[in-house]
Amino acid sequence: DALPIYNVSSFGGASVKRIHRPVNAEGKTVSVGSYMIPLLQENCEKAGVKMMLDTTATEILTDANGAAVGVKATGASGETVTVNAKAVVLATGGFGANLDMVVKYKPELKGFMTTNAPGIQGQGIEMAQAIGAATVDMDQIQIHPTVEANTAALITEGLRGDGAILINEEGQRFIDEVGTRDVVSAAEIAQTGSYSWLVVDQAMADASSVIQGYIDRK
């Protein structure tokens, strides 16, 4: 079934409004991930897809010709789990929470925090390399301009798409807030103290449960 995400806004670098977001019963926008994952899980269950939670993949299995034919993993109780398959789809994400790996490929990011989930350690990449997979553009690590420094909470750029502005220590705007993340981040780093304030108005706060969530988190 299609997910009902009909609120449309702009994100960084977009030439037109094309970012679809969900809303709650009050008509306020809500976080996409926490809204979408339960619905995707429900649809997977309807389709008979078997989900193995708390299970960590450790090795991609290959046949005599080197083709990927399954995965070996460790289950929640420490048991070995083997999944044999006709093919393996690698969709493990990146390595943003593995700060040593980040610095290995992009030394200038040493000292940066991460907004990634703790499990984003790059194991999928390493498993693929172990069976001969090539990598490309490993240094192309995205940094985000709106991160709360004390909690590492990522503040969605959807707020900037809705009209929030960035001001520096001198109280001045310094960039087009809906530029691409690399451009906005570079401009922010160049400001005094390498930080900025994200300013929203009351109308934006009233229309978004996400903003209230940021306030409550502090």
Ranges and model annotations:
Residues Q121, I125-M127, I131-K218:
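An anion/pyrophosphate-binding glycine-rich loop and adjacent beta-alpha core
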Residues T58, S77-G78, V88-L90, F95-G96, ...:
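Short, glycine-/Ser/Thr-/acidic-enriched flexible segments
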Residues A76-E148, A152-A153:
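Glycine-rich loop(s) and the adjacent beta-strand/alpha-helix scaffold that form part
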Residues K17-G27, M52, T115-A117, L154-G158, ...:
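Short Gly/Pro-enriched turn/cap motifs at secondary-structure boundaries
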Residues V71, V83-A85, D176-E177:
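Short capping micro-motif at the N-terminus of alpha-helices
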Residues D1-V81, N98-M101, H144:
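Conserved redox-cofactor binding core of oxidoreductases
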